[in-house]
Amino acid sequence: MALKTFKPYTKSTRATVVVDKSSLWKGSSYKPLTRGQNVTGGRNNAGRITSRHMGGGSKHKFRIIDFFRKKKDIIATVDRIEYDPNRTAYIALVTYTDNEKSYIICPQELKVGDKIQAGKNAEIKIGNSLELKDIPPGTSIHNVELIPGNGGKLARSAGSSITLSGYDGDYAILKLSSGETRKVNSACIGTIGVVSNPDQKNIKIGKAGRNRWRGKRPQTRGVAMNPVDHPHGGGEGKTSGGRSPVSPWGQSAKGLKTRRPQRSDKLIITRRKKRRR
């Protein structure tokens, strides 16, 4: 996929860069695997805001994705590749030899008409899904399970992938795109290839209205609020906050580790890279 720019008829079109989706399926989604979804606007059942800066946006129907690759040792044919408004990756509609259809995360270089398979008998080929112990080291994989039978959890967004580094007993050693190296049970399932739509990281929104279409509302700075609303609020004239950056509830917003200790910590070999701040 290529990037698409626009002639500068307006200030917003001058800045806008989007992904060219002209090669994707132009019809509607497959109805038996599609359902409606309610938009909460960031409110809970009491009507109170629990997630700020959410609301509005275009209506989307939810596509039911098979993260488990349940149909083992049955060959499937790729019918079409579609845009999914609920995720950055593209999805592929596949038909199995028993005429059952399902949506899967579409990897790069997967084309309409390709044959894919899941299970022990599958080849090491893009789109095929196998247990990690059956995949050779150095292979790029995506949609990887953390617990056997729980469905793919890792590397599902556009352009992401995991490198299978090797094995240590009953565990496979994975190098994640974040820089983290961790062990995962080698009976977990992963899919060969890199997730589609790698140009997603290069898009430019261009104007505030496009964020509103996506259901994102404006974000007010803490220093522009009153002291009753934010720790940085108040002051005479323009002030810089007077303290280290914090959230509206007083929690440090710069570098504080918020992940609680878990039993799975012992499986993490190397932590992810620190962001530059």
Briefly describe each language-model feature range.
Residues Y96-N99, S177-S178:
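Short acidic-glycine loop/turn motifs at beta-strand connectors
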Residues Y96, C106, G166:
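Conserved strand-loop elements at the edges of beta-sheets that form or border functional pockets
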Residues N86, V94-Y96:
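Structural recognition of beta-strand segments within beta-rich domains
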Residues A92-L93, A172:
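Short, hydrophobic/aromatic-rich beta-strand segments within well-structured domains
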Residues N99-K111:
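Beta-strand/loop nucleic-acid-binding surfaces
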Residues M1-R87, V112-R277:
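Basic, glycine/proline-rich low-complexity segments that contact nucleic acids
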Residues A89-A92, Y103-I105, N128-S129:
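Short, conserved acidic/polar surface loops in the N-terminal third of protein domains
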